[in-house]
């Protein structure tokens, strides 16, 4: 699922399925998502995306999540010059989104899904502000140009947020949804990194950027092992929402009690000291193989397998239809309609 699995992790703190996309196969399930939880705290919710609403079954599963608004490609000027790869380029996407964002009733919870910095990383010459890399692998070479283009589009959007007054009144989370370059590009990545792009290095390349802006908080770098499954608990705590009664597999990244264990969907995992990659153990700090699996490592492997099994049970059995925390009202998907409309007030549901 990649992107769709990432959204499942972000919105629900549930893992994707071992096969297929839960967005497609479990699109009618009951969920206790970020948009539903925050909606019952008075937040208007919206998704902005420069592709069409049916992609990844978003037009159906977002109703199960309780999203008030979904601004898909039908809301944007999809002229040929501004469309590339999977949809609208990031710069016109953010620019055209400003009007819709400003029309939302505050407070709001919104999500922007960008497209330009996505495999195979095509970019028009007029949009590239830096030279490509020179590995001879076109996808690796243009990756950096599309990343720079994304950076420039985000800067322009942040400038708008500051000018409009939203920046100083918003928690902003920026993250990557999945890896950029797969292990099929080993030779080119070896040239880029200046070292062998082996199994261990490929696992490290699964890391994605995560930046959190909180008004009034001094910026800095926090060294922490975590995954996308931890984003929802972190966001809820930043907004003062108690998540103890919700079924979530992640923990608050900013808490002293955060568990520094990152499960992969295939049962592999990473910790600050050791990792299991492809069933083999490695020293996480040096990348050196570990010949003998210790008792602690075996217990960690079993813990990861159990956590994935429990998450699968929730999705496969649609178990959240049987449970809701006190005070939480289950989402009624029939209230939501994402056909293009003039008003974006949440009362139009």
Feature locations, PLM:
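Solvent-exposed soluble domains appended to multi-pass membrane proteins
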Residues: 1-349
